[in-house]
Amino acid sequence: MNSSKNKILFRCDAAYIPEIGSGHLYRCLTIAKLLKKKFKLSNQNILFIIKVSKKFGLAKKIIENEKFNFIKILDHKIKNYSDKELKIINKFSSRLIVIDRLDKISKNFILRLKNNYKKIILLDDASNNRKYADLALNPTILNVERTNNCKIGYKYNIIPSILHERKAIKKKTDGFFLFFGGFDKNNYTKKIGDILLKLNMNSKIFINSDKKLLFKPEKRTKILFFKKKDHYKTLLKSKYIISAGGLGMFDGIALNKALICIPQYNHQKKNINNLEKRGAIIKLESKNKKKIKELFINLLKNKINLEKLKNNQKKILNFNHVKNNLLKISAVYEKN
């Protein structure tokens, strides 16, 4: 592959592994698509470096579907920010490199990256070495030291829903949209889906078609299964979103939906607790089926003030915030 053609390189992963999932890759894909459009780039100008073996096969599956070029890291045991990883990344060069992962970059690693990459952007890095990057965005990892080049807070997120037109839906929104990320570690889709089905309600239940076999044939007839390509179309026409605390949750906030969240991992739990305190979401305790059932019944009977929740969401993350973040990223790319 001709390294001179690369304008932007992304280093991120997606995996059927707790704390990784698919959000980091989808966030990078969102940036890639928007920069491609803004700067009239081709897919040949954009390169992803991803792990592909074993549980990291999720990344390969997603990237191939999106038709971007990618380099495979075949050894899934290579550690983040190790000399081995640096050797692979520095086989290439580009105007900009974007690294998206929950980790801490070392000073040695980022300074040696500068030999091959003019500009560096970090997403959700937790180290003090973020100060050596041209831009660091921390929309979900918030307990970090502030630096001049770092923006910290939920409003600095990049979410895939920005790519999809928010067409006005004339019909009243209805139904529960269930989505627990690229890796539903705790099988919440099945557990919550079963609770909703037992309510025998008139409201629709929307679930991705790749989860169809989780449900018995007689239950499948009561669920509206959507294809992956219709994810955001279905999301827009849903009234309630039930999600984990990943990128899907932030899509729900920006889309101003009635949002019910169950944490899958520790960092998600922190954000969900914080957002609940700020009145932007409804938190669910997954182990208490009785309370979950009561919540759904109260929602359907309009006993919960959703307007207040939606007003609080607008202050936390909206599409103007996302557009401003993309302008910041574009400015880094353009700067000599």
Model-derived regions, located:
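A nucleotide-sugar donor-handling region in carbohydrate enzymes
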Residues: 131-187
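Conserved donor-nucleotide binding/catalytic region of nucleotide-linked donor-dependent transferases
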Residues: 282, 287-316, 335
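Short internal beta-strands
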Residues: 45-53, 205-210
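Nucleotide-sugar donor-binding patch of glycosyltransferase catalytic domains
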Residues: 257-291
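A donor-sugar binding/catalytic signature common to diverse glycosyltransferases
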Residues: 22, 229-271
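C-terminal alpha-helical cap of glycosyltransferases
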Residues: 318-336
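Donor-nucleotide binding loops and adjacent catalytic segments primarily
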Residues: 174-239, 249
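Active-site and donor-binding regions of nucleotide-sugar-utilizing enzymes
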Residues: 10-19, 27-38, 51-65, 69-146
